Regions:
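Short acidic, hydrophobic short linear motifs in intrinsically disordered regions
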Residues: 27-37
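Alpha-helical DNA-recognition elements
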Residues: 55
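Short, cationic-aromatic polyanion-contact patches
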Residues: 67-85
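Amphipathic alpha-helical dimerization/coiled-coil segments
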Residues: 85-128
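Short, positively charged loop/turn segments that connect secondary-structure elements
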Residues: 38-49
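Short beta-strand "wing" residues that participate in macromolecule-binding interfaces
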Residues: 63-64, 114
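Short alpha-helical segments that sit at the start of domains
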Residues: 1-20, 24, 81
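Glycine-centered, phosphate/nucleic-acid-interacting loop/turn motifs that mediate DNA/RNA or nucleotide
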Residues: 60
Length: 128
């Protein structure tokens, strides 16, 4: 994965497209993106998707490669990089960088299932 600037905010619609490309685990053709959106109940016009892909390219999240008459879209930011950026942003904005506050909130607000709690505890214990 090429280094990219991840600090560009993306819209929910742009994130929907990135999730499709990330799930593809490699370059995605425009037709695949359109089919995947339709399967998720998103009946966006072709021009709307083209505009969203263009914005993602401008923001450094994607690059397009011409294959004959088709475009292949390649992610420049991995899903993990994006998740890390968003988690840090939430941590800084809402919890003022206090990881303990975030984890405490997750546990005390019953947002975690029993299995998720055990997995988190194992991670925090360092696998001990």
């Amino acid at each position: 994965m090429e280094a990219a600037i991840v600090d560009q905010q993306i819209s929910d619609a742009e994130l929907d497209i990135m999730k499709i490309i990330w799930a593809n685990e490699g370059p995605a053709l425009f037709a695949h993106i359109m089919d995947s959106l339709a399967a998720k109940g998103k009946t966006w016009q072709k021009n709307t998707v083209i505009m969203l892909l263009s914005r993602l390219k401008d923001k450094g999240y994607l690059k397009a490669k011409k294959i004959g008459r088709r475009n292949e879209y390649i992610p420049l930011v991995s899903e993990t990089e994006y998740q890390t950026f968003q988690t840090k942003k939430l941590l800084d904005k809402v919890y003022e960088g206090n990881v303990k506050g975030l984890v405490s909130n997750l546990i005390q607000s019953d947002l975690l299932t029993g299995e998720e709690y055990r997995e988190l505890k194992k991670l925090l214990d360092g696998g001990r």
